[in-house]
Amino acid sequence: EEKLKEYSVDILHAKKWLTALIHIEAENAEGPNALQKELIPISVRQIAEDHLRDYCRFTIFNSSAGITLIAAIDENNSQTGLLDHLGDICKECRRVLEVTVTIAVGHSCQKLSELSRMYQSAVDALGYRSIVGVGQTIYINDVEPVSRGKLKFDNADENDFVTAVKFGPEEKIRETIH
């Protein structure tokens, strides 16, 4: 929090935060020349900033996974509204810049200390673009079930389960599960 204050990043004191990754898809077509390709990320970032400026408080920066967005959700906006704005950004980048942009949105968090985990969920959401498609918003809650806890086995139980699934009849599988 001190660093956010020090650098005047205005996302503190929100109800929750969302992280998103803006990924510019590689184009195989005869597109812009090399100089124009270098300018595309700057233009995409500018479009995102213009769309979100009047909607929510946010910070946007470059990271190893792409253009990263952290948005503050409070009483003046909503998570659903933000997802709609992100979808509009994808459409406008396609229309204006003629580039395909996919925006992956991670889980929301209510504590800033959870941002790194939420960022990882946005990276995970980006991994679904080959299944869901590109040029749109991919929200992690839409593609992954909400975790209810992990199934835990000890080594013996795990071996019994794997053996039953691989080699056993249906009755053996049911017996092993129960």
Report the location of each language-model feature.
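Hydrophobic, helix-rich cores of sensory/ligand-binding and other regulatory modules
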Residues: E1-H178
